[in-house]
Amino acid sequence: IGKSSLKLKNNDAIECCFEPMPIDKAIIPEKLNLDIIYEDAHLAVINKPAGLVVHPGSGNYGGTLLNGLLYHFKTLSKGDSHRPGIVHRLDKDTSGVILIAKNDQSHEHLNKQFSNRLVKKEYIALVWGKLEEEGCVEHAIDRHPKNRKILTVVQNKGRNSLTYYKRVEYLAPLSMVNLYPKTGRKHQLRVHMKSIGHPIFNDSAYGGGAKYAKSFHIKYTQLINRLLKTIPRVALHARKIEILHPGSEQWMCFEAPLPLDLITALEILKSENS
């Protein structure tokens, strides 16, 4: 089929070619340098660096966070048989705090908290433009009709999603913002920021890549190019997560410090805006 707009007629013949399904591969423990924020008999909390895939998948059969977890920890929850210990995920380019369950009881306990929206999460991001001081985005999210690898806001279908935001500081041409997702949809924060005209910096999949710089005065060109080199990924960091501990039933808050690329970018922006 040469064009997606081509309409089929009766008796048309279609030849389909499918790639063979990958052979199920055992997940091999690998010695990775994990930044372990907290650990006890029930759970572990990791500060995931940007660029690290959470679990093996198509094209990523090794060097993932899960490979490192299997090496470092004697026990992990069974969870999904292919993702032991993994309670929730972060995108490859997103840095920050991620929870790991060390037994099935803890996994179930944490899963229920996510399902019941008890988990409190805070992200920090750099977004394009001057975002209003605070607000919320409430849009349903679904697969993009033309590009199935990304998501988009939709009407009358999709999955409901809600994000609160608060601008911390405007450092032209970007805003430093805190994001508080109340639902946990895939790419939620990235989709929501794009939907209100302030995509996350260097998020090319959602309109925030280098091309977005054309929206700004030429006086910002040199600064933007410098920032793109400083943060060669989506400028999004999972800074805090607050949960009921599955053993003690006490609230606990875990925080991942800002990574060097974001610290450096903020220093550059503050210097240029002083």
Locate predicted features.
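RNA pseudouridine synthases
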Residues: 1-274
